[in-house]
């Protein structure tokens, strides 16, 4: 993929925020949304830690905290949060050139170059945790395993030095595909949740799609009708396009 790559999430987020403010958006940082205000099947706004905010349209896009907000409305889409570990491995000064960007379905890890000769490796999607209480560090056992696994793809990584790591959260749905839709039965309520670790790269398109949905328009960019909130209740989960083959 000659046009593939990666971006710094902090810089991109700040860039989005700054441009949004120029376009008239108000961003309220550190003000927790505690509940969605509903009356007679219609959205009235949200309750926050500093008071109510009134609006006839609300998009729940709270990542790991989306499930709790939906559950308070009696909505359960099977959303879970899982812990994902990230390791930084330094290959040393003698190594020349960057390694490839890898997504290894068989061994269950992804990797990309970082600063200098450091490789960033992400792994683990099985440990279900709460969004506020989980181990934000990494596991020694997983470090040993992942260093052995990635050495099968990039020789020499077994000698790399562990220089840091952390754990974050994926928000996942039962079929590991996002929900992008309005909520039937509650006028003015919309959801954009469950990106399984892909939300950062998909966010520009998600913003366009959700804008179309809120305006009652068919998206001109991509058909997201299969990502509706009712697909689980109706027995229409999405199928994964990830696949692997073994050559014997």
Per-range role (PLM):
Residues 19, 23, 72, 209, ...:
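Active-site catalytic microenvironments for nucleophilic, acid-base chemistry
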Residues 148-248:
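C-terminal catalytic lobe of FAD-dependent flavoproteins
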Residues 1-57:
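Helical element adjacent to the flavin cofactor pocket in flavoenzyme catalytic cores
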Residues 1-19, 63-65, 106, 142-149, ...:
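Mid-domain beta-loop-alpha active-site segment that forms a flexible
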Residues 35-37, 54, 101, 110, ...:
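Short, surface-exposed charged micro-motifs
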Residues 48-98, 221:
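Central helical "cap/lid" subdomain
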Residues 78, 91-189:
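Active-site lid/adjacent beta-loop-alpha segment flanking the redox-cofactor pocket in flavoenzymes
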């Amino acid at each position: 993929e000659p046009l593939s790559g990666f971006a710094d999430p902090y810089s991109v987020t700040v860039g989005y925020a700054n441009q949004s403010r120029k376009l008239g958006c108000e961003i309220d940082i550190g003000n927790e949304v505690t509940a969605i205000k509903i009356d007679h099947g219609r959205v009235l706004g949200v309750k926050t830690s500093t008071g109510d905010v009134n609006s006839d349209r609300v998009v729940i896009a709270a990542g790991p905290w989306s499930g709790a907000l939906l559950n308070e409305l009696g909505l359960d889409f099977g959303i879970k949060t899982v812990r994902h570990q990230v390791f930084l491995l330094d290959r040393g000064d003698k190594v020349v050139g960057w390694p490839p960007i890898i997504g290894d379905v068989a061994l269950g890890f992804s990797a990309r170059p970082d600063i200098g000769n450091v490789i960033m490796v992400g792994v683990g999607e099985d440990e279900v945790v709460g969004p506020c209480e989980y181990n934000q560090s990494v596991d020694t056992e997983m470090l040993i395993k992942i260093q052995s696994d990635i050495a099968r793809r990039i020789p020499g990584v077994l000698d790399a030095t562990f220089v840091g790591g952390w754990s974050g959260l994926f928000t996942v749905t039962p079929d590991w595909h996002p929900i992008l839709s309005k909520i039937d039965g509650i006028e003015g309520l919309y959801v954009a949740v469950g990106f399984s670790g892909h939300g950062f790269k998909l966010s520009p398109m998600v913003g366009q799609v959700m804008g179309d949905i809120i305006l009652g328009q068919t998206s001109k960019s991509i058909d997201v009708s299969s990502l509706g909130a009712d697909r689980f209740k109706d027995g229409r989960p999405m199928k994964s396009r990830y696949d692997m083959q073994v050559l014997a």
